[in-house]
């Protein structure tokens, strides 16, 4: 079975971690890593024998056989890349908060949006918390959802820091659009503690039907689904009910592919993005009669 060729734009922390995950994939071929300067990430890819370029999106557009493109740059660059990739007939998996296309959280709504040419991976906080809000909403009705994502300062590179406002806005909106909450709010905290902390997310949901047994069963089932592509995802505080307010907390340990294990915040979004790409690649293989 021929693998589906993919490219990564943006050879930073997220792009490099994506590269290692793609190299392990049974369905994806890492065909190109591209950036705009001769960075460490570009050198790293070249050492692994991967084709590289410092011509950014232009290099991707020149490669007709690349079908799926991961954009790990930033919100503003992706707004420029998106129409170019669409015009070239390439599927864009957007790991920035640009949100040109619909939000996708693999365990919640991939089947509904997989035909779209541009899929947005929300944010790391969104991938960690939207499924829990969705799980609570489907059995109890979520009037309001608020999440606090606490990540190690060391795991936040320049791209993450430049996109803090977009992070909070995009995550809050995804709590509503994908999670099902009537109103959502997101807060991010960069914790400079040494040794660095694991990504920790606290989720507060005001519910219409406070049935704790149904809520716990729904959340536990969802956690198992997430663990199928993010093995380091853990429910550290099972849902607690106080009146009509549910509190839960999850922790994410990274796989340690490229980033340290405390960078679970980055690992969850790269793992989710690769899970999406693998599903799309399998469908492309069937469609093109390659499988």
UniProtKB/Swiss-Prot annotation:
Alphabetical list of SMART domains matching this protein: Semialdhyde_dh
A family per Pfam: Semialdhyde_dh
CDD domains: ALDH_C (cd23933)
Source organism, top-level taxon: Bacteria
Active site, renumbered: 124
Binding site for NAD(+): 155-163, 265
Enzymatic class: oxidoreductase
Disulphide bonds in the chain: none
InterPro entries registered for this protein in UniProt: Acetaldehyde_dehydrogenase, Acetylaldehyde_DH_C, NAD(P)-bd_dom_sf, Semialdehyde_DH_NAD-bd
EC number: 1.2.1.10
One Gene Ontology MF term: acetaldehyde dehydrogenase (acetylating) activity
Reactions that this protein is recorded to catalyse: acetaldehyde + NAD(+) + CoA = acetyl-CoA + NADH + H(+)
Keywords carried by this UniProt record: Aromatic hydrocarbons catabolism, NAD, Oxidoreductase
GO biological process, one term: catabolic process
Family: Belongs to the acetaldehyde dehydrogenase family.
Protein name in the entry: Acetaldehyde dehydrogenase
Organism the protein comes from: Moorella thermoacetica (strain ATCC 39073 / JCM 9320)
Native organism taxonomy: Bacteria, Bacillati, Bacillota, Clostridia, Moorellales
């Amino acid at each position: 079975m021929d693998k589906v060729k993919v490219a990564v734009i943006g050879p930073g922390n997220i792009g490099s971690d994506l590269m290692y995950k793609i190299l392990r994939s049974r369905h994806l071929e890492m065909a190109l890593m591209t950036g705009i300067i001769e960075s460490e990430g570009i050198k790293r890819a070249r050492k692994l024998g991967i084709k590289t370029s410092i011509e950014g999106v232009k290099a991707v557009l020149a490669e007709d056989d690349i079908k799926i493109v991961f954009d790990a740059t930033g919100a503003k660059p992706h707004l420029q890349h998106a129409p170019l990739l669409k015009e070239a007939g390439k599927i864009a998996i957007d790991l920035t908060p640009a949100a040109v296309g619909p939000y996708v959280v693999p365990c919640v709504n991939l089947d509904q949006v997989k035909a779209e040419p541009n899929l947005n991976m929300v944010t790391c906080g969104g991938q960690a918390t939207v499924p829990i809000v969705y799980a609570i909403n489907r059995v109890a009705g979520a009037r309001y959802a608020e999440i606090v994502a606490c990540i190690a300062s060391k795991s936040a590179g320049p791209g993450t820091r430049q996109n803090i406002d977009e992070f909070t806005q995009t995550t809050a909106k995804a709590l509503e659009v994908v999670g099902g909450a009537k109103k959502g709010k997101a807060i991010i905290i960069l914790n400079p503690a040494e040794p660095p902390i694991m990504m920790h997310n606290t989720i507060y949901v005001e519910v219409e039907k406070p049935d704790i047994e149904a809520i716990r069963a729904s959340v536990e089932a969802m956690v198992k689904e997430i663990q199928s592509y993010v093995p380091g995802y853990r429910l550290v505080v099972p849902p607690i009910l106080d009146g009509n307010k549910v509190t839960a907390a999850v922790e994410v340990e990274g796989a340690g592919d490229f980033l340290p294990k405390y960078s679970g915040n980055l690992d969850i979004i790269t793992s989710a993005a690769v899970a999406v790409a693998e599903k799309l690649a399998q469908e492309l293989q069937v469609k093109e009669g390659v499988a």
